[in-house]
Design a protein with these regions (language model features):
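Helical transmembrane-bundle signal
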Residues: 10, 71, 75, 113-119, ...
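Interfacial and helix-entry/exit segments of alpha-helical transmembrane bundles
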Residues: 6, 35-106, 135-153
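Predominantly late transmembrane helices and immediately cytosolic-facing juxtamembrane segments
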Residues: 34-38, 104-138
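Cytoplasmic/organellar membrane-interface segments at the starts of transmembrane helices
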Residues: 50, 62-67, 121-181
Length: 181
């Protein structure tokens, strides 16, 4: 996020439309992704009745499969898997950075994506590949339903991103050229 913020600050100073628009796309998409992740982990904290640590997630993929699968989709979106809004974010960020010849920023975004793969894999490993395999427990619909609304939005905006992109382009126009009546 810090890398993206720095890059966006640079493109804003240059008043580059593609950079500002990609920043808006990223802010929207990233908010959905992180919102879904935090909601899922928050639900695990309620179920676990304690602070959630990496070790406490052992077997949760089997114990709470509905919420765990939502967390998996959100995490894959954070990494930038195609058909998720995270992929759209990364695609537009890379295009804007390349257009502005910001090759160091491209490398930093690529490294941060690789790090996301590493740390998210540790979560997946604990949830599904640890020795502990629980029997599935009933999950509260009123809690996992909002998590899944966000998760489905992540997929929908990954497949049909036109409204977000158009709104981001319009917002970039207004920000760069100023609102004219």
């Amino acid at each position: 996020d810090a890398v993206v913020s720095r890059g966006l600050g640079d493109v804003y100073k240059r008043q580059d439309h593609s950079g500002v628009a990609s920043g808006f796309v990223h802010i929207f998409n990233h908010a959905l992704i992180k919102g879904g992740l935090f909601m899922a982990v928050g639900y695990f904290a309620i179920l676990y009745k304690d602070r959630v640590t990496l070790n406490s997630l052992k077997g949760f993929g089997y114990k709470y499969p509905i919420t765990s699968f939502a967390l998996l989709i959100c995490g894959l979106s954070l990494i930038g898997l195609p058909l998720t809004n995270g992929f759209i974010s990364k695609l537009y960020l890379f295009q804007a950075l390349y257009t502005n010849q910001m090759y160091l920023s491209i490398a930093l975004v690529a490294v941060s994506s690789a790090l996301a793969v590493v740390y998210f894999w540790k979560i997946v490993e604990q949830m599904w590949f640890s020795e502990i395999k629980f029997k599935s427990e009933k999950e509260d619909t009123y809690i996992y339903l909002p998590i899944w609304i966000v998760t489905i939005s992540i997929i929908v905006f990954g497949i049909y991103s036109t409204p977000i992109i158009e709104f981001s382009n319009l917002s970039a126009d207004y920000l760069i050229s100023g609102y004219q009546n």
